[in-house]
């Protein structure tokens, strides 16, 4: 994903590499299609103009098809879920564990009633680039502890998830497609076939905005994180550079702040989240620096039960009849995160393995950078899909 494959891989190893690439593409392609503001920001980094104010054209189809092999690199992919019916974070994790991903740590977000695990990509040579860096992103998967919600919100989720065979026995299969396990057929999250009632959605939104997002989007990508340290040029400002592992020029920045400034300036005018009190979230050790855009929005068709005849107590999950109507509502979709992993003190990299030396700075391998995740950072990043960020972002 981040660069050329090591030389002399066996046919079996090449097949493993292609299979994992295809799985990641299966998530990323619909993610970009559903979130036009996210795609525009990614396009700007992939195909920049010659100046910071030049209009940035959309990717042509041929260029879009190259995205997954030529982009400078995803830091991680993130998913949300409910801890129900053998689903939860394990349903998504199983999709990646079969490709060699391994769990490296757990995080707990008490106020949000959420647990998470992060997974490292395969360590095998086939999953690395020619420099030895991981060629595939980390994985961050979380789920909501449904039993910790108020009764009315818990019952909405149990009505949707707890009675659905697809969300249990076949959860991983649906997760592979980024589908909605509790819909009729694991369909595209943007389709109006899921038959979620507006009052159900609002009940969840009031109890947990994480829950409301997950009800609508299921196992779709919550966000992709760009490895900004792979964009860096060790000088001030921004310049256009030709990647060693791509025919495409790309932006390179002196800092995470410079990257954000570029994205926020016209013509992009990207909205960034300030959840947690600031735009850039920094770990206590200073080694992990993160920021995110405000989530895109998606028009979703909900069942409006406000006109249901009095005394009719049937739930939406039992079917839709002539007395119910659809109403459209804009809901938070997905966002893009930007991550800067600083070099570990005393491990600044190897000048003899310096792919960026010509740009004025030594290449620092990924193994010499701050790894993992930080609870406080992630807690704030979660809120990129919250309504307050839509208003204030």
Annotate each predicted stretch with a short phrase:
Residues 4-93, 98-393:
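Extended, well-ordered protein cores
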């Amino acid at each position: 994903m981040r660069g050329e494959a090591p030389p002399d891989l066996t046919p079996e190893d090449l097949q493993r590499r292609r299979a994992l690439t295809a799985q990641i593409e299966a998530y990323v392609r619909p993610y970009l299609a559903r979130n036009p503001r996210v795609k525009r920001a990614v396009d700007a980094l992939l195909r920049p103009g010659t100046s910071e104010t030049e209009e940035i054209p959309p990717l042509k189809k041929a260029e879009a098809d190259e995205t997954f092999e030529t982009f400078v690199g995803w830091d991680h992919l993130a998913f949300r879920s409910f801890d129900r019916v053998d689903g939860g974070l394990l349903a998504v994790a199983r999709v990646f564990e079969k490709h060699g991903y391994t769990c490296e740590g757990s995080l707990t977000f008490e106020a949000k009633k959420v647990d998470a695990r992060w997974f490292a990509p395969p360590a095998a040579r086939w999953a690395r680039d020619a420099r030895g860096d991981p060629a595939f992103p980390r994985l961050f998967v979380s789920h909501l502890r449904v039993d910790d919600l108020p009764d009315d919100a818990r019952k909405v989720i149990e009505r949707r998830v707890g009675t659905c065979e697809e969300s249990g026995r076949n959860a991983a299969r649906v997760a592979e497609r980024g589908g909605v396990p509790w819909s009729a057929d694991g369909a595209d999250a943007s389709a109006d076939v899921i038959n979620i009632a507006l009052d159900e959605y609002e009940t969840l939104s009031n109890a947990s905005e994480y829950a409301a997002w997950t009800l609508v989007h299921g196992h779709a990508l919550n966000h992709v994180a760009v490895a900004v340290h792979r964009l860096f040029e060790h000088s001030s400002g921004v310049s256009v550079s030709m990647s060693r592992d791509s025919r495409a020029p790309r932006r390179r920045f002196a800092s995470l702040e410079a990257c954000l400034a570029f994205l926020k300036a016209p013509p992009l005018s990207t909205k960034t989240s300030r959840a947690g009190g600031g735009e850039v979230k920094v770990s206590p050790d200073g080694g992990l620096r993160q920021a995110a855009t405000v989530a895109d929005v998606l028009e979703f068709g909900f069942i409006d039960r406000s006109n249901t005849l009095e005394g009719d107590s049937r739930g939406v999950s039992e079917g839709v009849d002539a007395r119910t109507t659809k109403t459209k509502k804009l809901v938070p979709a997905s966002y893009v995160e930007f991550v800067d992993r600083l070099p570990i003190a005393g491990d600044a990299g190897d000048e003899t393995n310096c792919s960026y030396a010509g740009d004025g700075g030594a290449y620092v391998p990924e193994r010499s950078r701050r790894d993992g995740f930080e609870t406080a950072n992630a807690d704030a990043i979660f809120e990129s899909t919250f309504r307050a960020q839509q208003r204030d972002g």
